[in-house]
Swiss-Prot record:
Tissue spec. comment: Expressed by the venom gland.
Protein name: U1-lycotoxin-Ls1c
Organism (species): Lycosa singoriensis
Propeptide span(s): 21-41
Disulphides: 44-59, 51-68, 58-86, 70-84
Places the protein is found: Secreted
Any one GO cellular component localisation term in the record: extracellular region
Length: 107
């Protein structure tokens, strides 16, 4: 009986050790991922800034992520170029207005 308890204790120790090693590896990978996300967040394009070269890099606003909105600009030479900026789409503006109004009414 004593041998069985020793073997079970040994197995539990080995399993907990191996799982903690896996958890440590997982935590390290997760930490690296979070650091990469933080770096990306620092490099996002603010509202009203140009996003022509980085159309998916707009920052987050109060409720929604800003969208890269593009327009075609005709230069004096007659060339058409696309210019983009990060902004809030009209349906997001409406949602923010409703939420703000609701907060004023309901506290």
């Amino acid at each position: 009986m004593m041998k069985v308890l020793v073997v079970v204790a040994l197995l539990v120790t080995l399993i907990s050790y191996s799982s903690s090693e896996g958890i440590d590896d997982l935590e390290a990978d997760e930490l690296l991922s979070l650091m990469a996300n933080e770096q990306t967040r620092k490099e996002c394009v603010p509202k009203h800034h140009e996003c022509t070269s980085n159309k998916h890099g707009c920052c987050r606003g109060n409720f929604f992520k800003y969208k890269c909105q593009c327009t075609t600009v005709v230069t004096q030479d007659g060339e058409q170029t696309e210019r983009c900026f990060c902004g809030t789409p009209p349906h997001h503006k409406a949602a923010e207005l409703v939420v703000g109004f609701g907060k004023k009414i309901f506290g």
